[in-house]
Amino acid sequence: MEALVYTFLLVSTLGILFFAIFFREPPKVPTKGGKEN
């Protein structure tokens, strides 16, 4: 059971980090879906 909890925490942290980066990058580029969708 502990393994599941640790995995969930790891995935959650990674997800939050990715979301933070993904939402922080777009504002810098006014054009939507230019080089990367």
Swiss-Prot record:
Main localization of the protein described in the UniProt heading: plastid
Localization terms from the record: Plastid, Chloroplast thylakoid membrane
TM segment ranges: 3-23
Keywords: Chloroplast, Membrane, Photosynthesis, Photosystem II, Plastid, Thylakoid, Transmembrane, Transmembrane helix
SUPFAM superfamilies noted in UniProt: Photosystem II reaction center protein T, PsbT
Membrane topology note: Single-pass membrane protein
Residue pairs linked by disulfide bridges in the UniProt entry: none
One GO CC annotation: photosystem II reaction center
GO biological processes: photosynthesis
InterPro entries: PSII_PsbT, PSII_PsbT_sf
Assigned protein family: Belongs to the PsbT family.
Subunit field text: PSII is composed of 1 copy each of membrane proteins PsbA, PsbB, PsbC, PsbD, PsbE, PsbF, PsbH, PsbI, PsbJ, PsbK, PsbL, PsbM, PsbT, PsbY, PsbZ, Psb30/Ycf12, at least 3 peripheral proteins of the oxygen-evolving complex and a large number of cofactors. It forms dimeric complexes.
Cited function: Found at the monomer-monomer interface of the photosystem II (PS II) dimer, plays a role in assembly and dimerization of PSII. PSII is a light-driven water plastoquinone oxidoreductase, using light energy to abstract electrons from H(2)O, generating a proton gradient subsequently used for ATP formation.
The protein's name: Photosystem II reaction center protein T
Designated gene of the protein: psbT
